[in-house]
Amino acid sequence: MLVGAARSEILPPNTVSTYGLTETCGGVVYDGVALSDVEVRLSNGRIHVRTPSMARSYRHGPLPLIDGWLDTGDLGTFVESPHDGSLAQGMLRVDGRSDDLIITGGNKVWPHIVEQRLREHPLVADVVVRGVPDTEWGAIVKAWIAPTSMDRPPTLDALRAHVKETLAAYCAPQRMTLVESIPRSALGKVLVSELPE
């Protein structure tokens, strides 16, 4: 089941998260736990994996492996196991792509967390959040909003106030662009290159 950015409260209770990459030839982590023969470690928050099922190379060159470890480009955290506590390092929580993280004025902002909050606003049908360069802050938070009605879209001030109710002020979008719809691939992935400036 592809759930993309679905809200957790609308997912069936038996939904589990899995994690894998093309390079690992499929899933390597099931519900936060590495499969047998799979090693997972974090280095500066970045997820590294080593598995016997690792691809040998890319079509046009070698995999960037160091001692068999692949830097996935994803950021993660080991969190306490809600099960019996027997997992020494905890369960893997994937926080997002390292290149998606917005650093604004030295503060870290995960776009998917801001998107989740903005989707809760009654005038927002869909949203995507990204960092855009800024000379003063390094980057600022920008939201592309597909409103429920283009005749009655939310204001930037209203959305900022909505975000600040539950998240830090620096997470609130500094800029907003209204769009009819968020451009997505057939699998629901946002087509960032098709977003208007």
Functional labels for PLM-detected ranges:
Residues 29-32, 43, 79, 146:
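Short beta-strand-to-turn element immediately C-terminal to the catalytic PLP-Schiff-base lysine
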Residues 167-190:
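AMP-binding/adenylate-forming catalytic domain of the ANL superfamily
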Residues 33-36, 41-71, 107-109:
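Conserved ATP/PPi-binding loop(s) of AMP-dependent carboxylate-activating enzymes
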Residues 51, 73-171, 194:
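AMP-binding/adenylate-forming catalytic core of the ANL superfamily
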Residues 189-197:
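Phosphopantetheine-dependent thiolation modules in NRPS/PKS and related acyl-activating systems
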Residues 1-32, 39-41:
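Gly/Ser/Thr-rich phosphate-binding loop
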Residues 44, 89, 185-187:
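Residue-level recognition of short loop/turn positions
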Residues 2, 129, 177-178:
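Hydrophobic/anchoring residues in structured secondary elements
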